[in-house]
Amino acid sequence: MNYIVTHPGSAHKDDFLACSVLAAEFAIPIYRRDPTEAEIEDPSVFVVDVGGSHDPERLNFDHHQFSSDHPPTCSLSLVFRYLGVYDDAVRFCPWMKTAEWLDARGARQTAEWMKVDPFVVAQLSSPIDFSLLRYFAEEQELSIHHPIGALMARIGGDLLNYLRSLRRNLNELSNCVEFWKIADLEICYLPKIEGMSADLSSALTMFVREQDRDIAGTVSPDKRGSGFGMTRFNDDRRLNFTQIEHEADVHFAHKQGFIAKTSASDPERLKHLLAQSQVL
């Protein structure tokens, strides 16, 4: 892939992020100008958010030609689909659908979709967004060595790394977690695994959210110690870990009852502590 062409003038979050992701993936420069007809036809040039065409084989990723009743779509949606991470982006990035709505429908319709006052959408805006988009819009050419181009590549790389590593971790978790029945509660347990990365434990909440099960809590290796952490899932009040705060092998129990840390590692002992934590 040779380079990216996107429109000149004001920039929006979707074209900024779409270009960031492509710059990270292919280490190529960005040109902010109208594309030529030759570039639109060239399968080695990414044409993003301009050009009136969505044709992944020719690397065309514009959405402005879609009909008014087309599902909200932005240039980032199209680039994510091209890279095979769109479904996970929608699933695991809560801001993704909002970004699509804002770009395709505007703030007022987005507010109606979110069931909030339009002013709330403005309240969620960030001065970081404003400055980055302005700096991006001021440039005509950005290589990955340009200060803004380098930052964009870092942002795009972070996005792709998050989505791809999360998918790997979720696939791995499906092969190693256990589901315990503690009285009438179901608990998701992640055992210690040799060489396990901290990211695997961090993905446990996402994994549980994907399950069609009534999970009350999780048990996973403590990132800061040798024992385990026990946590309510979705703040499930059927568990209250203050009920085990005086146990000798429990060195921390939050006063709000949603988490506890224990030096215990034997599964039977962990199950016993969970049973003691159940609110009857």
Predicted regions and their residues:
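Short helix-capping/linker segments at secondary-structure and domain boundaries
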Residues: 2, 25-29, 84-90
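Short coil/turn segments at beta-strand junctions that form active-site/ligand-binding loops
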Residues: 1-3, 42-46, 55-58, 184-185
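A basic- and aromatic-enriched beta-loop-alpha substructure that forms the phosphate/nucleotide-
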Residues: 45-130
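Conserved beta-strand termini and adjacent loop/short-helix elements that scaffold enzyme active sites
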Residues: 33-35, 63, 220
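C-terminal accessory domains and tails appended to enzymatic cores
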Residues: 9, 13-20, 41-44, 68-73, ...
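Short, hydrophobic/aliphatic alpha-helical segments
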Residues: 1-4, 243-245
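N-terminal ordered "arm"
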Residues: 5-45, 52
